Amino acid sequence: MHVRDHNLAFKRRGLLLTLLVGGLALGMSAVGLSGCSQGVAAPSLQLPPLPYSQNALEPYISQKTVEFHYGKHHLAYVEKTNELIKGTNLAQLSLGEIIKQTAGSPDKAAIFNNAAQAWNHNFYWQSLKPGGGKPEGELLTKIQASFGSVENLKKQLQDAATTQFGSGWAWLVADGDKLKVVKTGNAENPMVQGLTPLLAIDVWEHAYYLDYQNRRADYVKALIDNLLNWEFAAANLPKA
């Protein structure tokens, strides 16, 4: 074969390979992350994109903290969950369903811990918003009915997040028609107690240590006063 013919054949093979790969990618895109068709492997859990840029929470949370917290810790929980559920029936489920099905099972503790931490972090990033805001409408009415005032709610959140011993979370939750502040240790999630999370504050040290060192109370106050996403909380209220 002449060199020219050889080059043409090589180019044809390259074109066919490109079309094949493109077709596979298109097919995978059509399946999506919400489900899988018969004979197609279950989609893996993904790290959701942040709802803002990595420096958007400054000066209260630095870009460096977000890079480590989101890009290292949060990602690791997602990847470990995928590793642990691969090839099991759990691989077909959402994070929320995985949490509910593994809660309280000692033999599935590793799956629960990683799945819950992945879910908790998804929720935490959405619980924050550059510039924060104020509770309004139905949420404000429920806060006043449950706590007396927004300031009383903020004080309870501050106390819960600051006094949580060791790693964990502070939450604003709905319990039926009433709102409550609860705290959970390690990876625990209020959903397994039948509560509806509205907002979350991460008090694991990786959430604040680069910026605040051991001053957890300062970190918590900065979030409550400047970054809490009250619109997100309102959207999470149980529907009547």
PLM regions: where:
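Conserved alpha-helical segments that form or flank metal/cofactor-binding pockets of metalloenzymes
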Residues: 78-92, 106-139
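N-terminal secretory signal peptides and thylakoid transit peptides that target proteins
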Residues: 2-23
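Gram-negative bacterial Sec-dependent N-terminal signal peptides
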Residues: 17-36
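An amphipathic alpha-helical core segment
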Residues: 159-214, 220-231
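Alpha-helical scaffold segments that form or flank carboxylate-/histidine-based iron centers
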Residues: 59-73, 96-119, 186-189, 193-201
